[in-house]
């Protein structure tokens, strides 16, 4: 083995504190190191060229780069390895800038010692580095889109135009979602169906789109590139290829009246009906729960499209990626009994008002008081019904309700100028483009706004609904009767979402909508590879945001499936079948469902493995390992650190790449100092930290161990830090049982932005360890190493 060590000056960023020449000399004396060199700027063109020349001239087969953070330049130096015809994963970076020179400028001597310790740890790991290469596999270019609302439509058209085959599955009998039911849309007051209908028709007619309406996804298995999908098409009892959409002929003869689900209880339809006039496809359906089987519609249909014997149809296909655009459902206003919905006919929801305002809706665009059939002279809107409300379990804001109420109040005012309109609100949230102007315009039209919660709605002596409310701006409780009360109901995840979430193993937010991989950096990526979230599937949002997310999802899919092949990250998990005992521990630990048991052995889906390492930490026999973060590699770092204990107390820290290690980097960038007593080992996730690593550090002489990961509920692998915390909590009890002070193991759950807190934690931990004393000092008998060794076994 021939290892080359390179130490970067980084101008004075490193060399201004650390004795770089001494590092070069000490590194050159390490076992297996055949070349050690200090360079002004390793990342410069000349620096990179020098490394390439050295590798070729000296037949170097491993490289250690002591410079800045691997989060900054790891890819840079991997490319250098490739140019030198060396496998890029035979290089290890050592962070002596952000986590050494920048945080220990007040103690150059110990900073130099710490830097050498880190280099020694890097060389120890380098001895166990293996050649890694990305593997590729064929991927289906077909894309499954679940949900045919505006977000799904936008994604489908973007993909289809780019040449990708798309299969759209919509559980309702028409695509278009809630937008297709609305009258006009804010803030421009465009006719909703006028702008949406052309896109709906384009979806139906596009040669690259296969559309299944009145259908549900019943099973999804497999993983990115090769999802196996099963869809059930429910019977319409009308043949799609024969129906001409001439609904009047069949509907007129039907003797049964029903409530059209698209009208939310306003008006009536027949048992054979068209969902909305602009339905896509233009095909009627029969409601089997109310149809009496009289046969009149079948006799009236000139196309012979009615088929009472139609059965559910099962369809199976492959998809390379999935876009979840399942939308939302409206809060059931009857759950707020104090508002009288379902009890008083003149208390309706905002969506019912939308259907009244729609010229193609059940009332032909007229707003009518249900009890009288006449236009209202006074209307009250009550905001936040079923949102921002702990009593119904919905503490979140539904984001759109304020603007929807403003829009509908404008519509009522325009059609019935003499109508008095009052909006009862907690806060008006008008934060989008042109929203504040829209709010001002509504006020200018004479709409009254009263800040405060509504206590109840009850029937007055004349039968009209009376609103009892607080006026917080005037500190009064008042009552007022209205002809019509409109409840602005909140948004909840759609009925389909729960099943889809189970099939795809999607995480949920506290508001029960699907959680993205990261709310800021990866807002449309699901935590599962090959799955993307668009529109209200990931929470309430406006139409324009849903459209933007549909386009974003399409772009992500194009990047993923553009070549028809998928490249697996070589640093995922892999199983040694000779060691595996088929215990299923890894299967249960992997929340992403990427491990299965085949022939009594664990098998990892390496193409879609996330690389968190949770499975590896849980494996009782060490059969499953994380490439580049294998047990022997990390243990080599631990032993190299503790074998030359350069100060007391001595702390070994395991930091996750995404938050705690990034936080340590930020601490350095902010020049926030902390004691030199800490030696950091990076893992991708805190879940990778095997209790064996901690015990090995303590057995080797470390006075304390710090395990740090992302804040709870913010782990980049969703569940990783929860599993890490459980393991460390148990380990603290074990440490206590063998006679050591459990305070020697400290955990920290921190964001990447909390540099001051990171520094304070290190400082406090070192002081605490000074009070406890050197490792084993609290024991009456000398059995520390023996006890730890037994526990490790």
Swiss-Prot record:
The keyword Chaperone appears for this protein: no
Keywords assigned: 4Fe-4S, Cytoplasm, FAD, Flavoprotein, Iron, Iron-sulfur, Metal-binding, Methanogenesis, Oxidoreductase, Repeat
Keyword Zinc: no
Binding site for [4Fe-4S] cluster 4: 590, 609, 612, 615
SUPFAM superfamilies per record: 4Fe-4S ferredoxins, FAD/NAD(P)-binding domain
Superkingdom per UniProt: Archaea
GO BP field: methanogenesis
Enzyme kind, highest EC tier: oxidoreductase
Cofactor(s) listed: [4Fe-4S] cluster; FAD
PROSITE patterns noted in UniProt: 4FE4S_FER_1, 4FE4S_FER_2
Family: Belongs to the HdrA family.
Known partners and oligomeric status: The ferredoxin:CoB-CoM heterodisulfide reductase is composed of three subunits; HdrA, HdrB and HdrC.
Role according to the record: Part of a complex that catalyzes the reversible reduction of CoM-S-S-CoB to the thiol-coenzymes H-S-CoM (coenzyme M) and H-S-CoB (coenzyme B).
Protein's UniProt name: Ferredoxin:CoB-CoM heterodisulfide reductase subunit A
Organism in which the protein naturally occurs: Methanosarcina mazei (strain ATCC BAA-159 / DSM 3647 / Goe1 / Go1 / JCM 11833 / OCM 88) (Methanosarcina frisia)
Origin organism lineage: Archaea, Methanobacteriati, Methanobacteriota, Stenosarchaea group, Methanomicrobia
Gene that produces this protein: hdrA
